[in-house]
Amino acid sequence: MAYFDATAPLAQPTQPNSSPVVAAALAPGANCQRRLLTNTIDGRLIAVDADTGQFCQGFGTNGQVNLKAGLGDVPDSFYQLSSAPLMAGTTVVVGGRVADNVQTDMPGGVIRGFDVITGQMRWAFDPGNPEDRNAPADGSTYVRSTPNSWAPMSYDPAMNTVFLPMGSSSTDIYGVERSKLDHTYGASVLALDATTGDEKWVYQTVHNDLWDFDLPMQPSLIDFTKD
């Protein structure tokens, strides 16, 4: 789970050229001043009051956001949430696990950031359409079968940056239909601006991963002293 306290001071990044953290707007006395956020295996993001356990009524629809929105054909077993949401400033970031080696047409691996108070989507990073931060138009979907981020992510508040471990595209051990962007983001560490979702950089660890290696763990953030 992730935790957010709307009454606590809001820390801003300290590194130069970092985007500011968006203020959290919550009326005094409203419920869910302290809230817990979790996701479910059937594709929901849920916010509850940390003191009472009640749903946060101002978050999404009755405290829930449908994470299958924009994914197209997505049976429960094809798309699941296998890691906790990440609290990055006032943005809740979620990835998702796409089932391995099922078929070539699978849900996309979009990564999304949501307002911690309202549940409104702030941005989407679609590995198959990385310049567009918006939800797909009605009748359209995020690009299908793209690399996904199913393992835990990391957040550096000093830079307001999210670091994501990326998996491979579908189908994991069959590369014939992979695009140039699949080859760019598969099996890589991806750094995104937590406020905007814009890409900062990407570093690939395995080129054309045909072994389903993925990056299966949370990136570690370490400060080194330079002589």
Walk through the language-model features, giving the residues of each.
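Repeat-blade elements of multi-bladed beta-propeller folds
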Residues: 1-44, 77-103, 108-110, 142-178, ...
